[in-house]
Amino acid sequence: MTVIAVTSWEGTPEAIENLIKGSKASAPIHEKMGAKNPRLWRAIAGDGMESAFYSIEFESHSAYGAFTDEMLGSDWWKEQIVEAAGAAYPDLKNNGTTVYYYAIEID
């Protein structure tokens, strides 16, 4: 069952540009930890120009759990989320991560 984790970010234009740079640097690290298809989504029209959504995919809930265990124990977590994202607040806000499953996946 495909699982996708989507982290919602909100920030100033400068903070979002820094998030883009950070996401580019983080994507290969996340892939080494087991994530697939890291992407940063931005609005092209309408509301939400101050928002960005970072998504990563997994083959199963257990794969997502293994990724989370590794990520939370990593230096990357401490340096990029706790320290860098913490220092960017309130210009950049992490609004949390929602985990979805692909409900109509066909075997």
Model-derived segments and spans:
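Short hydrophobic/aromatic beta-strand micro-patches
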Residues: 10, 55-57
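Active-site-flanking beta-strand signature of metal-NTP-handling nucleotidyl enzymes
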Residues: 3-10
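Short, surface-exposed ligand-recognition loops at beta-strand->loop->(often short) alpha-helix junctions
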Residues: 10-21
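Specificity-determining recognition surfaces
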Residues: 103-104
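An amphipathic, aromatic/His-enriched active-site/gating alpha helix that lines ligand/cofactor pockets
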Residues: 21-39, 48, 57-98
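Conserved beta-strand-loop-alpha-helix junction that forms the acyl-donor binding cleft
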Residues: 45
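Short, surface-exposed coil-to-beta transition loops
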Residues: 4, 49-53
